[in-house]
From Swiss-Prot:
Molecular functions (GO terms): MAP kinase tyrosine/serine/threonine phosphatase activity; protein serine/threonine phosphatase activity; protein tyrosine phosphatase activity
Statement: the UniProt record of this protein carries the keyword Cell membrane: no
Domain of life (superkingdom): Eukaryota
Source organism phylogeny: Eukaryota, Metazoa, Chordata, Craniata, Vertebrata
Organism field: Homo sapiens
Gene3D superfamilies xrefs: Protein tyrosine phosphatase superfamily (3.90.190.10)
Protein name in the entry: Dual specificity protein phosphatase 21
Length: 190
């Protein structure tokens, strides 16, 4: 991974990895589910200054002093999240440069928000898609972008680096990212 260690340090008081509430990805970027995104105590204790809601089904409670951004995308294979990769990555970066903190969330903090996080790490931390996924999964083990988002992330990685570190492969359950091939083989052999 090419990002500096300081940009990934945890703040004091944040335990990692956190599956059900906030997961700190970088010093200024967090992932969560929709319930945690509406928890005033969690937001204030983690000094969140911006919330990106990557869902159509979660309604945010608006708290003073927090900027809210809506990315109205469903968690479906044919949903177009790619168009939001650059604008949301740029926003997260701008907030970080101003010493702010961003919370990305969707319904469960598994697919849509995780995909936006991976795009940000590729663009602003020069991480390959594979490294971005490995890092983010180490911080939030439940991430699992849907296959349509994987295809879009693979295209985005190619746009950024003219190279791919993850590819879609054919499997008994359809096309999947090659990083899931080992897990699938283990499941099938059981």
């Amino acid at each position: 991974m090419t990002a500096s260690a300081s940009s990934f340090s945890s703040s004091q008081g944040v335990q990692q990895p956190s599956i059900y509430s906030f997961s700190q990805i970088t010093r200024s970027l967090f992932l969560s589910n929709g319930v945690a995104a509406n928890d005033k105590l969690l937001l204030s204790s983690n000094r969140i200054t911006a919330i990106v809601n990557a869902s159509v089904e979660v309604v945010n409670v608006f708290f003073e002093g927090i900027q809210y951004i809506k990315v109205p995308v469903t968690d479906a294979r044919d949903s177009r999240l790619y168009d939001f990769f650059d604008p949301i990555a740029d926003l997260i970066h701008t907030i970080d440069m101003r010493q702010g903190r961003t919370l990305l969330h969707c319904m469960a903090g598994v697919s849509r928000s995780a995909s936006l996080c991976l795009a940000y790490l590729m663009k602003y931390h020069s991480m390959s898609l594979l490294d971005a996924h490995t890092w983010t999964k180490s911080r939030r083990p439940i991430i699992r972008p849907n296959n349509g988002f994987w295809e879009q992330l693979i295209n985005y990685e190619f746009k950024l680096f003219n190279n791919n570190t993850v590819r879609m492969i054919n499997s008994p359950v359809g096309n999947i990212p090659d990083i899931y091939e080992k897990d699938l083989r283990m499941m099938i052999s059981m």
